Regions:
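N-terminal export signals
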Residues: 1-18
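Glyoxalase I/VOC metalloenzyme domain signal
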Residues: 19-26, 31-52, 69-226
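A short beta-turn/loop motif at secondary-structure boundaries
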Residues: 57-60, 133-135
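N-terminal low-complexity or amphipathic/hydrophobic leaders
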Residues: 60-71
Length: 226
């Protein structure tokens, strides 16, 4: 049974605030790749599941392929879009030596409220800003994204999907369910402070190099990626 991000077990209370565990709060995990086919093949080789082409991000210079991680959660394989060669590669995807997890997004039902909560906790935000993706069927999927000042590695952004729009997890091939989501960073206290300011708890560990570690229960067994 796949995990639903709204399950009651995903919530805890601390000092009167309602906290979500990152494993339930995340909307999607971004796996960066220098080439989309290479990223799709990298996942398929490890899991036996082939991602579905998601579409292009107009003006962003990227395109993606998707895999569902349960209701309200998905893995996004993102890579440069050859059809947009003049758009700067802001994430440095084309320079990646191999596919790896580069970012994560947290779901918000009210992006304005998320912004107010974060700023009340002393966290600087960017936006919200509109985003869009053109699906293969020609339909445009739209959202609002709220950025957080990157004072430490692994800080997420927050996303609110346009009302009535189908969530990308709803029609993407099923990869499996999330067993664990871990964050390794040289600055665990700073990352923890930022996440708690947005009412998110996470498994954060101190290491020399920052990375996001996702473990998925697939038909082939547990698969770890970072």
């Amino acid at each position: 049974m796949l995990r639903n991000r709204f399950a009651a077990s995903s919530w805890s209370t601390t000092s009167g605030l309602l906290f979500r565990d990152a494993k339930d709060a995340f909307d999607h995990i971004l796996l960066g790749a220098p080439d989309l086919d290479r990223g799709v093949g990298w996942i398929e080789e490890r899991t036996g599941v082939r991602a579905q082409f998601g579409g292009n991000h107009p003006g962003r210079g990227t395109r993606n392929a998707l895999l569902s991680l349960g209701t309200g959660h998905y893995l996004e394989i993102i890579a440069p879009d050859p059809a947009q060669p003049n758009v700067p590669d802001e994430r440095g995807l084309g320079r990646l030596p191999s596919p790896r997890i580069i970012q994560w997004a947290v779901h918000s039902d009210d992006i304005a409220a998320t912004k107010r909560m974060a700023e009340a906790a002393g966290i600087k935000t960017i936006g919200p800003q509109p985003g869009s993706r053109q699906r293969p069927d020609g339909k445009m999927l739209r959202w609002q994204a709220l950025g957080i000042e990157q004072t430490t590695p692994l800080v997420p952004f927050f996303i609110q999907w346009q009302k009535g729009a189908p969530h990308p997890s709803s029609d993407a091939p099923e990869l499996g369910s999330v067993k664990s989501l871990r964050f390794e960073t040289p600055q665990p206290d700073e990352l923890r402070r930022i996440l708690r300011g947005a009412a998110v708890e996470a498994d954060i560990r101190k290491t020399n190099l920052p990375r996001i570690v996702l473990t998925v229960q697939t038909a082939r067994g547990e698969v770890e990626m970072s």
